[in-house]
Amino acid sequence: TIQRGKCESPNDIQTTVIAKPALQPSEITQKAPSEPLVSLSDARRGFKTEKKKKKSTQQPVEQPPSDLFQVIKYSAPSGELAAYLSPNPGDGKRHPAMIWITGGDCNSIGDVWSAAPRSNDQTAAAFRKAGMVMMFPSLRGGNDNPGAREGFFGEVDDVLAAASYLQKLDFVDPKRIYLGGHSTGGTLVLLVAEYSDRFRSVFSFGPVADVSSYGADSGFLPFNTSIKNEVKLRSPIYWLSSIKSPVWVFEGTEGNIDSLKAMAKISTNAHVHFIAIRGANHFATLAPTNQLIARKILQDTGEFSNLSFSEEEVRQNVMQ
């Protein structure tokens, strides 16, 4: 079962969430360089995805505690979509903001406010606790939203629409909007970074290099996976050269590390940074690394982002 807004826990993890490569890393890296050197935005132009017909679960958005989040609607190409948004702090200031895409069923949102253990905190609570504005957008076909799930394709446009909503709020600094995500959400935010330089920095935890590794029966790929371009346009490894803003990719060596290694091996893009966290799993990276990111974002106030992370710094922060 795919959970709304949450990746499976480490004890009962399904292989459809921590993906096993359909291709070995060496096969992926041999395949990707032979592809045409075009940007993801150019490659997507005019492409019509062929979606599988699937009955929507139509689960309404769960109501959050009003002191932490409100439910809003933002306009996207697929229609009016729901999101959780931090309330206006009411201090007259513009604050940095984080859009976060959860793992598992990343089209839907659910409980992102209950306390979670440090070893598996998928709520990204570090950012709101640091005083940042948080937005958790649901995407097309998720919850009771209009539109149909496309599995890492049209959802890219929805995330960008969420950013457009945020930048118009008088309590958000439009030049300091960040994007992050975990697992399937990590894959999606990496694709967003490959498609657009809209975000000041992007943080991708545990993405896959090639979405076919999720498996046709995972529920994450509602399209014909036998069509090469359907898979390719959703697979981050082919479009790393398109990235034009700072991107940080994190994963524990006990998690979905093969994908990180495959992308790190092929990438020559100085905007993309890959950090393998020795001894950590797919989940333990989240809470401590998000705390580190949040602290640094509060100091990231210049015209251009000054964020930097070393592998040793991140590892020590996770293991302490």
Regions found by a protein language model. Name each.
Residues 102, 271-320:
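C-terminal catalytic histidine-bearing segment of alpha/beta-hydrolase fold enzymes
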Residues 171-183:
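Alpha/beta-hydrolase fold nucleophile elbow
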Residues 150-170:
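Alpha/beta-hydrolase active-site loop
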Residues 91-95, 100-147, 212:
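Short substrate-entry loop that stabilizes the transition state in hydrolases
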